[in-house]
């Protein structure tokens, strides 16, 4: 039987960033091959650093998918744990070591007997940086294994052990990276009339773009436009030629995200025209679409967990953070949910360390749900 705690600790020590999860993939394949030995209804494929494990059903009517992410973050770990990261500057600070371990535990249970329906376990790379789910889908990695329904979870530090939280609509917002560069004309600070100050134009843009959310977004829906980087100039007495802004757009629906993206671009171009200068606007959403749960499937999952002993189900509001499972859920109906890990430190914090008792709870809960879906 798989030692969940040791497996998690092994994985925790080898975090790797997206599409570089070579040790992680090797470790996972070793475990998967041991678990699936002698199971003639199992097939395994790899895609770059990702893994797909397909359990052929005995009388399949559909394919049920379970997705886990496998990448770490470029963070220096500060937990002080004896099994801390052995990779300098890399850490499993978002709980993907837990996600992988739970998926392996569920795979082990699913292999106890051939399921009626097909089951697909997806070990997806590059959730954090390259939207690996989108890359796999667009590259045809699923082939005829593409699920009819897709499920997944994410650990959440501010929920207690035994709590599961989701809803029947949006769980994560869609995110879009924004880069804007204004280009004017540099010059001496004493002669502003001979220059065209990009810093002034960029500053004007930052104030004007605030109207996008306040005047273009339905207040019931909500959206966020934040610029966290503003770079302009190198010294006090020189008017800068260029100004660079780097920010993010977040919205509950893809339609709203596209509207906000359009308005941000329009405001930037309008400001540039008003100041008679050039502007470059780069909008990069990629696969980070809103994670929109299928209402009927979410209701089914919520009812299932609500009746499970030891589980407290919470109907939760959307999170303004992003998650690339949204892309796959834009192609396949499915549900994502939160699993409580009761940590005082937030996701992506260098001291984030979940409670390991969650592993057994997660495996028991998820495997029982997948068993139900596989038998329908």
Curated annotation (Swiss-Prot):
Signal peptide: none annotated. One of its GO terms (molecular function) is N-acetyldiaminopimelate deacetylase activity. SUPFAM superfamilies: Bacterial exopeptidase dimerisation domain, Zn-dependent exopeptidases. Its EC number is 3.5.1.47. It catalyses: N-acetyl-(2S,6S)-2,6-diaminopimelate + H2O = (2S,6S)-2,6-diaminopimelate + acetate. This is N-acetyldiaminopimelate deacetylase. Pfam families: M20_dimer, Peptidase_M20. The active site is at 69, 128 (proton acceptor). The keyword Cell cycle does not apply. Pathway: Amino-acid biosynthesis; L-lysine biosynthesis via DAP pathway; LL-2,6-diaminopimelate from (S)-tetrahydrodipicolinate (acetylase route): step 3/3. InterPro entries: AcetylDAP_deacetylase, Amidohydrolase, Bact_exopeptidase_dim_dom, Peptidase_M20, Peptidase_M20_dimer. Catalyzes the conversion of N-acetyl-diaminopimelate to diaminopimelate and acetate. It is an enzyme of class 3 (hydrolase). It comes from the Bacteria. Keywords: Amino-acid biosynthesis, Diaminopimelate biosynthesis, Hydrolase, Lysine biosynthesis. Belongs to the peptidase M20A family. N-acetyldiaminopimelate deacetylase subfamily.
């Amino acid at each position: 039987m798989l030692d969940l705690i040791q497996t998690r600790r092994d994985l925790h020590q080898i975090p790797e960033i997206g599409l570089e999860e070579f040790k992680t993939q090797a470790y996972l394949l070793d475990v998967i091959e041991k678990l699936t030995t002698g199971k003639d209804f199992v097939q395994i494929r790899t895609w770059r650093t990702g893994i797909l494990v397909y359990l052929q059903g005995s009388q399949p009517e559909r394919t049920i998918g379970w997705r886990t992410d496998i990448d770490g973050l470029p963070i220096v770990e500060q937990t002080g744990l004896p099994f801390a990261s052995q990779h300098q500057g890399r850490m499993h600070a978002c709980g993907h070591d837990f996600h992988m371990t739970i998926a392996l535990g569920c795979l082990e249970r699913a292999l106890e007997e051939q399921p009626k329906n097909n089951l697909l376990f997806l070990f997806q790379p590059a959730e954090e940086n390259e939207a690996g789910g989108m890359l796999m889908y667009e590259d045809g990695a699923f082939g005829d294994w593409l699920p009819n329904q897709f499920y997944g979870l994410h650990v959440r530090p501010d929920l207690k052990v035994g709590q599961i939280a989701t809803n029947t609509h949006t769980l994560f917002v869609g995110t879009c990276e924004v880069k804007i560069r204004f280009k004017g004309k540099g010059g001496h600070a004493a002669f502003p009339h001979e220059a065209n100050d990009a810093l002034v134009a960029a500053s004007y843009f930052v104030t004007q773009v605030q109207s996008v959310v306040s005047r273009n977004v339905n207040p019931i829906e909500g959206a966020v436009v934040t610029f966290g980087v503003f770079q302009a100039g190198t010294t006090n007495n020189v008017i800068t030629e260029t100004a660079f802004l780097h920010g993010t757009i977040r919205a509950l629906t893809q339609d709203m995200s596209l509207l906000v993206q359009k308005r941000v671009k329009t405001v930037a171009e309008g400001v540039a025209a008003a100041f008679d200068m050039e502007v470059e606007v780069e909008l990069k959403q990629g696969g980070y679409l809103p994670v929109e749960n299928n209402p009927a499937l979410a209701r089914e999952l919520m009812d299932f967990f609500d009746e499970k002993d030891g589980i407290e189900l919470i109907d939760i509001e959307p999170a303004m953070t992003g998650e690339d499972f949204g892309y796959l859920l834009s192609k396949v109906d499915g549900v994502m949910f939160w699993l409580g890990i009761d940590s005082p430190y937030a996701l992506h914090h260098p001291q984030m360390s979940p409670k390991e008792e969650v592993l057994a709870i997660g495996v028991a809960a998820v495997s029982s749900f997948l068993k139900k879906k596989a038998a329908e």
